[in-house]
Amino acid sequence: MKSTKELRTVAVRVPPRTTGAERRSAKAVLEVAAVCAGTGMALIVASDGAAGWRLARVAGVVTVVLGVLSLSRRRSITGLAVAGALFGLVVAPAGGAIGFPSLSRTGWSLRAGGGVLAALAGLVLLAVGTTLAARAVPGWRRLLGVPAALLGAYVVGMPVAVAVFATNVARTPLGSETPADRGLAFADASFVTSDGVTLSGWYVPSTNRAGVVVAHGASSTRSTVLDQAAVLARHGYGVLLFDARGLGRSGGRGMNLGWYGDEDMAAAVGYLEGRPDVDPGRIGAVGMSMGGEEAIGAMGADPRLQAVVAEGATGRGIGDLAWLDEAYGIRGRIQQQVSRLTYAMADLLTDARPPASLRSSVAAGAPRPVLLIAAGRVDEERLAGEFIREADPARVELWVVPGAAHTDALRAEPEAWEARVTGFLDANLRPAR
């Protein structure tokens, strides 16, 4: 016979079990929460964009919900619990990051209500699903739940959060400075994109018949590129600074991955093309970070852009991250997969379509030249720049600025920046003979 102590030990090792009634109740909760979460996400993804694309995104959400619900037919609740927890891990941060800010800014709307519903239902899925899944794991193995939860948060939660914040950008107000603070005469400018968004900017007239679009980075405005614009204006270039859509005084919805860049840049080039002081065959672009990526993308799609300077450009899609594998090995491959989920989620949350990779845009822009500027203190910029340059080393120049931070090359090396950038533009925006 076993001793009392041995019996107690055995009893401790028996995992708690759910009764049939508890199992049915838990299944019902998970099913209702999954439907509510799916409804909320459907309201979010159907809130903007072309009708066909809205329908496709809603169909994707419905497919996921049906997949989760299909697991409720099984006798074991574990599969449903795990699927529910994973679904909750996605929709809770996505719904919360969209719903509550929308509610505070604009009050109740389909988008705000959908976000709040998805967030609350996602939390229920996450809590109930995780609890039930943990009950199915015996003894010490439950301790593995902590690192598993952290891994899940990194692999799923973080990409979702990044995608949500990239596609739901708070409007950044225009700064108080204008070109006049740099001693430049200017005029207000506005122009409309091909999809009907009005963009706002400043224009400094040209004295050398060439024009340059100057594009800012994510979550900022034209005010942040005044220093770069002033350098170009001193050399006679007409300079158009504009707020990307959804930022500053421009209309539309912001997108920090730069996926609307082709449309925005095309409209900006069109504005310069129509200026009487600008030769339409002498138009270039200088972009910082997201603006640099947009300028490269625009060159691949718009033959009117004759030369591009891109500082701090690394990528805006999964095709731009192929260098991670070679540079960082297994860590790079993991980062690629995490980023793949980020871009997939972003694609679900916005009407903007994923753009061509920077490398393919450079190839499509041949034979027009590109100058890439990378921060010496940011290894990823150099590595990404080398990867982009491989598309056509003969016409893509990479300048790594020692000691410079992200988009800080002008401050770190003002004389060198002025000489390199204006020299590049002078050489490639010359009058046609």
For each predicted feature, which ranges?
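Membrane-embedded alpha-helical segments of integral membrane proteins
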Residues: 80-133
